[in-house]
Swiss-Prot record:
Along with COA3, core component of the MITRAC (mitochondrial translation regulation assembly intermediate of cytochrome c oxidase complex) complex. This is Cytochrome c oxidase assembly protein COX14. The keyword Transmembrane applies. Residues 38-57 are cytoplasmic. It comes from the Eukaryota. It is found in: Mitochondrion outer membrane. One of its GO terms (biological process) is mitochondrial cytochrome c oxidase assembly. GO terms for cellular component: mitochondrial inner membrane; mitochondrial outer membrane; mitochondrion.
Length: 57
């Protein structure tokens, strides 16, 4: 039977691990969103360039 201190240590380690995983997952989600934003911005610029060049000819 674990003592109170051991239970507290297990709880603390579990909580710390879950917070670390949530932080890593949040960073992943943020980086994916930023990547998609830059992809979208590049596509918008290319579309504007194509529209600009097709308007000249």
């Amino acid at each position: 039977m674990p003592t109170g201190k051991q239970l507290a240590d297990i709880g603390y380690k579990t909580f710390s691990t879950s917070m670390m995983l949530l932080t890593v997952y949040g960073g992943y989600l943020c980086s994916v969103r930023v990547y998609h934003y830059f992809q979208w911005r590049r596509a918008q610029r290319q579309a504007a360039e194509e529209q600009k060049t097709s308007g000249i000819m």
